[in-house]
Regions:
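Conserved core of the sugar-phosphate nucleotidyltransferase
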Residues: 11-94
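Left-handed beta-helix
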Residues: 75-84, 98-305
């Protein structure tokens, strides 16, 4: 069994991972990567000998605990364990032999990091597979935001255009995006977008996004829309006095994640003033200074937050 995490971004050859597991004769193999002290506080950290056998495991030691004894020894350091990245952290990616997995789950234990792995080390042969490539945990709003916007860089850390590690997605059968009289700098766009006379910087524009004339976006992740609105639906919106799906005219939006199907009216300003405290404000949230516009949100004309 290969156990993967759903909130991480990384390039890994799983076939190579499986091959190393089989060659080692281990019952369980844990994918690991070198991290700094600050990151180590939130991950399971471990000790491994010269043969990559794991001898000890500690789940999320926190920021105040003395873990100096867990620093990676020089003789077992890999190229990814550069100065400052002194601790070996579990990536939350595992391979279990089938019989071992069944035995580990035939009890009341439920949490891999806190229960199953520490108990498994006591009973089974558990090895580390040290991964030196790109890996980012995107389980928080801040980490998701930073990792996503990093993709807009000229040479991003995670490269979608690597011929040796291609990324595939399903075919949506949509037209290519249309950009009319707009200025885009360090921007990635998905299929089916229509961008008109807007200025967009360092942003990711999702599928079927509609961005109207005069708008300015910077540091924005726009998730897009599930469908296009018809002319009759837009007429109905006008009758109900609600914006169409997308971003209206003359909006200024910074430091934001806009979830799918959001309706942002004309002359809306988000992220230009003083950042409010983190919290739930109805149709939007603030997390680590990042504005999160909720799915299907309706933002009236002239709104300023």
């Amino acid at each position: 069994y290969i156990i993967l995490s759903g909130d991480q971004l990384y390039h890994m050859d799983l076939a190579e991972f499986l091959k190393k597991h089989q060659e080692s004769g281990a019952d369980i193999t844990i994918a690991c990567t070198a991290v700094n002290r600050a990151d180590a506080s939130g991950f399971g950290i471990l000790k491994a000998d010269k043969t990559n056998k794991i001898t000890e495991f500690m789940e999320k030691p926190g920021s105040t605990k003395d873990i100096s004894e867990w620093i990676i020894p020089d003789e077992t350091r890999t190229p990814g364990a550069v100065k400052g990245k002194d601790y070996l952290a579990s990536m939350g990616i595992y391979i279990f032999n089938a019989n071992v997995m069944e035995e580990c789950l035939n009890n009341t234990l439920t949490d891999f990091g806190k229960e199953i792995i520490p108990e498994g080390i006591k009973k089974y042969a558990v090895n580390a597979y040290v991964y030196d490539g790109y890996w980012e945990d995107i389980g928080t709003i801040r980490s998701f935001y930073d990792a996503t916007l990093d993709l807009t860089g000229i040479t991003p850390k995670f490269n979608f255009y690597d011929e040796d590690a291609p990324i595939y997605t399903h075919n949506r059968n949509l037209p290519s995006s249309k950009v009319n009289m707009a200025t885009l700098d360090q921007v990635t766009t998905s299929e089916g977008c229509v961008i008109t006379n807007a200025t967009i910087k360092r942003s990711v524009i999702g599928i079927r996004s509609i961005i109207e004339s005069g708008s300015y976006l910077e540091g924005v992740i726009c998730m897009g829309a599930d469908c296009y609105e018809t002319d009759s639906e837009k007429a109905d919106n006008a009758t109900k006095k609600i914006p169409n799906i997308g971003i209206g005219e003359r909006c200024v939006i910074r430091r934001s994640i806009i979830d799918k199907n959001a309706r942002i009216g004309k002359d809306v300003s988000i992220g230009m003033g003083k950042i409010p405290e983190d919290g739930d404000y109805g149709w939007y949230h603030v997390v680590d200074g990042i504005y999160v516009i909720t799915k299907n949100a309706c933002v009236p004309d002239g709104t300023v937050i």
